[in-house]
Regions:
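Active-site anion-handling motifs in enzyme catalytic cores
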Residues: 2-429
Length: 429
């Protein structure tokens, strides 16, 4: 393939309190390294701490990172100004929304070169909607074409490409008459993240008395991330509402995760470790899970006492027997290494949860409804008894993600539509 675009400026790295968010940027960069190695991707981060910068230096030693912001006088640093001058395209990285309006608007006014979105969700319903994935799909179909704000539609319609990380976003944007960009399925960049810190992982397992291939990981979550508490800010009214929802549902939801832990220990005879995808989950696990797990099982359960780095997490996931997660990105990281995984989807979660069905694994997702405990017990029992089908499922998800990422990367670089590459789980596949 002959490239028409040689330099991509990636606006990404939204947060460091979630290893899933941390994985977005290096995942997108790895996708370009694998499928368009002749292209340079420059990372323009929103938020990076030294821990994450160190990981990037080890995982992607050739990656150029430029810092700075945009204001009335333009770029705040010479390095950002140079990156903008040299970029053929501005690319909004994978994430929960198309939220970098200031940067996109400035680029449109002052630069005029192409821009696009790579692996994003645009959820018109959540929050505050509480629904299963089938219910969300029905609601998306019922929204009027005038639902999205005009400025959002204009920004999306002005893009060169909008690659949606799941088909509910794709359906939303099509129904809202977003017609000008190459509007297509394009997976979350996290699917391409493959870096691990095997040394740190081995040290952690040794310290906890765990053996590679002989333990399972369990990831807890609240229905809403408590950002006011995480960042030490005064809560807004909406955050107060979310906190009330969290407090009312935490026992119910974590009881399902506890059922998965009980089943794993009982059926496999092997230990479990409870680990965080987000920083607040360390306290959450210690406060709630011991009382939800039986005393005879609790001796086989380790609770990680710190928020771990992404590369250590992937190193542990890569040598585990199973990852059961209430967060969306740990199953992605596990699937990359062909590890059996289950995603427990809470009813407040966004349409991003659809991504697994789009990649050919709808059964990877278990909705936290009234049947969830029984469903997860059966699923964990099956994996503990015969993991081969779940290993094959994870391999399939990773392979399908690679195919879709390859198409998205090459289309972005060539400045051409993806074409007929529908997601595996879609009706068009």
């Amino acid at each position: 393939m002959t490239s028409t675009r040689h330099t991509v400026l990636l606006r990404s790295s939204w947060a460091t309190v979630n290893i899933g968010d941390v994985a977005h940027s290096p995942g997108v960069v790895r996708a370009f390294q694998r499928f368009a190695p002749e292209v340079e991707v420059i990372l323009w981060p929103v938020r990076l701490e030294e821990r994450e910068r160190s990981m990037l230096r080890h995982a992607l030693p050739d990656l150029r990172v430029v810092d700075g912001t945009l204001g009335g006088d333009g770029p705040s640093t010479p390095e950002l100004a140079a990156a903008i001058d040299g970029a053929d395209v501005l690319m909004h990285g994978s994430g929960a929304d198309a939220f970098q309006s200031t940067e996109i608007d400035w680029w449109r006014r002052h630069v005029g070169r192409p821009y696009g979105y790579f692996g994003v969700t645009v959820d018109p319903l959540c929050p505050p909607t509480v629904a299963t994935l089938p219910e969300l799909a029905q609601m998306v179909d019922l929204l009027p074409p005038s639902y999205l704000d005009d400025d959002v539609k204009d920004r999306l319609d002005g893009a060169d490409f909008v690659y949606c990380r799941e088909t509910l976003t794709l359906a939303t944007l099509r129904s809202q008459k977003i017609t000008r960009p190459d509007l297509a399925f394009g997976p979350d960049g996290t699917f391409a993240f493959d870096h691990t810190d095997a040394v740190a992982a081995a040290r952690l397992l040794e310290g906890l008395g765990l053996q590679p291939g002989r333990f399972a990981c369990f990831v807890p979550r609240l229905r809403y991330s408590p950002y006011a508490k995480i960042y030490g800010t005064d809560p807004t009214r909406e955050q107060m509402r979310r906190d009330a929802v969290n407090r009312a549902t935490v026992t119910h939801d974590l009881a399902v995760l506890a059922a998965a832990i009980e089943t794993w220990v009982r059926v496999s005879g092997l230990p479990a470790i409870v680990v965080p995808e987000m920083s607040y989950a360390v306290e959450l696990a210690h406060e709630h899970l011991p009382s939800l797990v039986s005393p005879q099982t609790l001796g086989q359960v380790r609770l990680l006492d710190r928020y771990w780095p992404l590369e250590e997490a992937t190193g542990v996931y890569a040598v585990s027997s199973l990852v059961v997660s209430m967060e969306c990105h740990s199953p992605i990281l596990a699937a990359r290494h062909a590890i059996p995984t289950i995603y427990l989807r809470q009813p407040t979660e966004t349409t991003k949860s659809q991504m697994f069905a789009d990649l050919g694994a709808p059964d990877l997702v278990i909705e936290l409804d009234h049947r969830a405990a029984a469903t997860v017990v059966a699923a964990v029992t099956d994996i503990a008894t015969d993991p081969a089908p779940a290993v094959a499922r994870s391999r399939r998800v990773a392979a399908n993600a690679d195919d879709a990422l390859r198409a998205a990367v090459r289309a972005c670089v060539a400045g051409q539509p993806i074409g007929s590459h529908p997601p595996v789980g879609s009706d068009d596949a």
